[in-house]
């Protein structure tokens, strides 16, 4: 069952409620963190957030695909993709199980 979607505004409100910064400062903080993560990923760097997970940029090489309607072979250009690998702590939290408290990442 899918839960609700958490937006930037929700994150800003949570920072405002829990940290005690003003709403403007909370929004700026959230934006700065997201921008830094995006900038690191754009440079091809891995972003590891302890007890949460890692965002990794992977290179996919050129390959041959196939048009499903015609069966014609079509080249697929090389590209970079972003992958999120959750930490074992986050996996245990999502599944409601108790982990050993150690992060595999």
Swiss-Prot record:
The keyword Transcription applies. GO terms for biological process: DNA recombination; positive regulation of metabolic process; regulation of DNA-templated transcription; regulation of translation. InterPro entries: Hist_DNA-bd, Histone-like_DNA-bd_CS, IHF-like_DNA-bd_dom_sf, IHF_alpha. Keywords: DNA recombination, DNA-binding, Transcription, Transcription regulation, Translation regulation. GO terms for cellular component: cytosol. One of its GO terms (molecular function) is structural constituent of chromatin. SUPFAM superfamilies: IHF-like DNA-binding proteins (SSF47729). It holds the Pfam family Bac_DNA_binding. Gene3D superfamilies: IHF-like DNA-binding proteins. This protein is one of the two subunits of integration host factor, a specific DNA-binding protein that functions in genetic recombination as well as in transcriptional and translational control. Belongs to the bacterial histone-like protein family. Heterodimer of an alpha and a beta chain. This is Integration host factor subunit alpha. It comes from Xanthobacter autotrophicus (strain ATCC BAA-1158 / Py2). The gene is ihfA.
């Amino acid at each position: 069952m899918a839960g609700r979607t958490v937006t930037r505004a929700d994150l800003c409100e949570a920072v405002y409620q829990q940290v005690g910064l003003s709403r403007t400062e909370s929004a700026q903080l959230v934006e700065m963190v997201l921008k830094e993560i995006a900038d690191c990923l754009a440079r091809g760097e891995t972003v590891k957030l302890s007890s949460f997970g890692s965002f990794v940029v992977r290179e996919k090489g050129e390959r041959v695909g196939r048009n499903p309607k015609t069966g014609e072979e079509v080249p697929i250009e090389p590209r970079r993709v972003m992958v999120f690998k959750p930490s074992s702590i986050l996996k245990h939290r999502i599944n409601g199980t108790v982990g050993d408290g150690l992060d595999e990442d």
